[in-house]
Amino acid sequence: VERAQVIQGTAWELDKTEVAFSPNPATGGESDNGFTFTQSLDFPTVYASRRNQLKAETQAEKSRLNVVSQQLKAEIANTYYQMLYQAHRLQILQRIDSVLERYSKIAEMRYKAGESRQLEYLSADRKCNENRLEMADVKSEIERLQIDLMTQLNTQEPIKPAEENLSAIAAQNLNSYNYQQSADGIYQQDKLIALDKEIKAAKSGFAPSLSLSLRTQCVISSWNPYNIDRSRFAEGNFFGFEIGVGIPLFYGSTKAKVKAAQKDRELAEIEMRQEQTEKERDFRLCTKRLQAASNRLKYYEQNNQAHSAQISKLSAIEYENGEISYVEYVNAIEETIAVLMKHADAINEYNQAVIAIQRLTGIM
């Protein structure tokens, strides 16, 4: 944007001023001896058209900056909520770790007391170790996401989620989508306006050019090889001016520039229509994705979340009392982990769907 604003200053660029010195020792103090200052310039409408084109291009760059800003915000939100999701998974695994550690100790005690086989103890120990390996993987993923977030925010300070628990993003005003009012649509429209101005600027090449020349006397009195009177005019040094008009008789190059600019405009319009179709399709897909994620989230929040906590608690008590076998207890633990993880997955999928729609609609 700053570069485009600076380039606006080139709209009124004039050609270089020509200075010619023409001494003629065969004449006296006449117009042959003097300086000539010549300035060529385009027709005034050329500068106006060029200025309008550069202003339109600056506006298009501002719109493009808004598109990039929306993309960056969406990437930051995506990374942030992915990190929050992984942190929530780590909390689940840490809670399960305490359960599995207790299960391993009980299995070891029962094995040493001769109340169970070694297979039960080995199975409990394996479950505990597998859970800790999963915890290590999740911690590594959190660190990776944290580095990504630091890069996106251009900071050296570690970023930690402000929320303690993973929760669904409040989805508001996500039911409709107007491409023309979105950041992408506004950018494409501004590009078309800039290309329209470019066509007008190219057509201004058919306008004539102007030139202005001023002459002033400059006699070198000491240089007189022919011994003639070379005295200066006593009344003054100004010898007159000359105004010229350049008529574009050969305008094939200008016609080619106009046609090229018109082709660029046609391609940009096709690109805008294609992008509009793609964005509207993406919105429909994201809406369906959000609805499916919402239904899945409601299911886990209304049913299985409470059931899994109850199953985990009852199975632990019954296993310690010897009322269920270790196989049944392992199944109960695995079911608890699966339900908690599926609930976390449902929240994450819902949040990602919301972020995708917010990116399209510009509500970030």
Model-assigned labels for residue ranges:
Residues 1-11, 68, 72-91, 109, ...:
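Amphipathic alpha-helical coiled-coil segments
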Residues 39-41, 62, 87, 140, ...:
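Residue-level signature of outer-membrane beta-barrel architecture
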Residues 1-17, 22, 41, 49, ...:
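Bacterial Sec-pathway N-terminal export signals of envelope proteins
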Residues 16-53, 213-253:
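Small/polar, glycine/serine/threonine/aspartate-rich low-complexity segments that form flexible
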Residues 52-55, 118-127, 259, 326-334:
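Short, charged, amphipathic alpha-helical segments
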